[in-house]
Amino acid sequence: VALLKRAQALGFPVAPTWVVDLEEEFFRLNNLEERLEALFRGVFGVRIDEERLLLASEEAVRAVRESYLLPERAEAFLEVLKGKGPFLLRYAGEGALERARTPREALFALKRLYSERFRVEAVLQRHPRLIPPFTPVLVQEAEEAAEDPFLSLDLSRALGREVVVFAHQGLLVRVESPYGG
C-alpha cells in the first residue's frame, strides 16, 4: 500500500483502490478464532495427524465461507463499489488474488480470500500459528495485472531503487521488489 501511495504521490497513475480492513471484526463477530482452534485441536502433536489436518482444513474453509459480515458492512462495501468493476482483490503485500466482475462477486471474493488462509498448505506454512495476522485486503478496479517493464523502469528511477510494477491499461496495480514481496 505504501509503495502504491508513494507512486501516486510521484504522479504515477494508480488503479482505483479501496483498502478493506474487516478481517479482524469478521473473525471476532463470528467467533472464528475459537471455532477454528477447536477444529485443529489434536492435529499438531509429536507428529502431524494428516487425516485430521485434511478434515480440519476442509471444515475451517467451510466455516469461514459460511460466516457473515455485519449487514451494514456488507451494504457499505457494495455501495462503495456500485457501478464499478471488474475487480482484483488481494491481501496487502501479497500477490495471490481473486477476481470479481461485480461488487457482489467482490464480496464473495473477499470471503474466499479469508477462507484460503485455512487450506492445508497455508496452515502448514504458518504452523505453529493457526490464525494468521489480520491484514487489509486491497480491492482494485482492474481486470488483470501484468508486469509492465516500462513503468517498472520509470518508477524504479523515481524511487531510487529497483521495483517491479504490475499494471492494467497503464494503471499501477501492484509494486514489489524484484526479489519477491
Role assignments for model-derived ranges:
Residues 87-91, 162-168:
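Short, hydrophobic/proline-enriched secondary-structure or compact coil segments at domain edges
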Residues 1-147, 152:
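N-terminal beta-alpha lobe that positions the nucleotide/phosphoryl donor
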